[in-house]
């Protein structure tokens, strides 16, 4: 089970000797001309504060403005343009209208210059180093189990009977309801291995898979069901856990916070939406802003030193040297048949 597999990584110290720095990276996704770039800036600064040894790649759609791309590059991100991926028949009412564009996330399986990547949504903040997750055994898909208790899940049988995998003994799944649902992860954070063959198969499977309310999250859960390994909630705290399953949350141990609840995006926060006036929410919003506003974490001002395989590598100096040499630029991924 997952705890044993997970333990193999948590016991690792430093970087695996056989892995080079360049073979691993974090990756996020950005689309449109809105304000989500602020979340990505906060994310890369959070990774920097946590002294991550790996870069953040931003997979952005063509509609991301040049101005926003430049901001991200100036913060040390690697900006990589991708083409959109759409479901075959857009006839489904998605839980949120903007979910349909998230199928484009599938493009990150094309990033085969990296042997392993950790995907993080742009509304996530990393408060502690999670580089050890790269040392999890290959061949599996690692992510945190989701919570079924919010109204966005009202279309599901789990929600209708009050069942949640975060507390499966509270309301049990009885035989008369049919087969027990498979474990279901939140796709805002996951550990995966890029692969062109996997990417091609993802697209082929997508063509014959009817869209569902949670778009690419449902699709990824279906596709990786047999190789999914849960990791602790500390690696992707969905804010609803604070009021739905507080017994499962220890904020002092949480490493990654996912600001996905309505009204919780720190850069848009007003405190007026339901549950947003909670003291724990206010604290987490402040923690995000403390990182975002910290000028010492800006890329040009960063003195972060990363532990490499044999010694220390200064991330800032390397990236600046690459930039001066003209190596850091937009990378356009090859188009694939849709």
Curated annotation (Swiss-Prot):
Active site at 105
Key words, A-Z: Carbohydrate metabolism, Cytoplasm, Galactose metabolism, Glycosyltransferase, Manganese, Metal-binding, Transferase
Reaction(s) catalysed by this chain, per the record, are: myo-inositol + UDP-alpha-D-galactose = alpha-D-galactosyl-(1->3)-1D-myo-inositol + UDP + H(+)
| Sequence positions that bind Mn(2+) | 121, 123, 258
Q: What is its EC number?
A: 2.4.1.123
Q: What domain of life is recorded for the organism?
A: Eukaryota
Q: In this record, what's one Pfam family? A: Glyco_transf_8
Indicate the segments annotated as coiled coil, or none if absent.
none
Q: Where in the cell is it found?
A: Cytoplasm
Q: Which GO terms describe its molecular function?
A: glycosyltransferase activity; inositol 3-alpha-galactosyltransferase activity; metal ion binding
Gene Ontology cellular-component terms for this entry are: cytoplasm
A biological process (GO) annotation for this entry? galactose metabolic process
Cofactor(s) needed for function = a divalent metal cation
UniProt similarity note:
Belongs to the glycosyltransferase 8 family. Galactosyltransferase subfamily.
**Function per UniProt:** Galactinol synthase involved in the biosynthesis of raffinose family oligosaccharides (RFOs) that function as osmoprotectants. May promote plant stress tolerance.
User: What is this protein's record name?
Assistant: Galactinol synthase 2
Species for this entry: Solanum lycopersicum (Tomato)
Q: What is the lineage of its organism?
A: Eukaryota, Viridiplantae, Streptophyta, Embryophyta, Tracheophyta
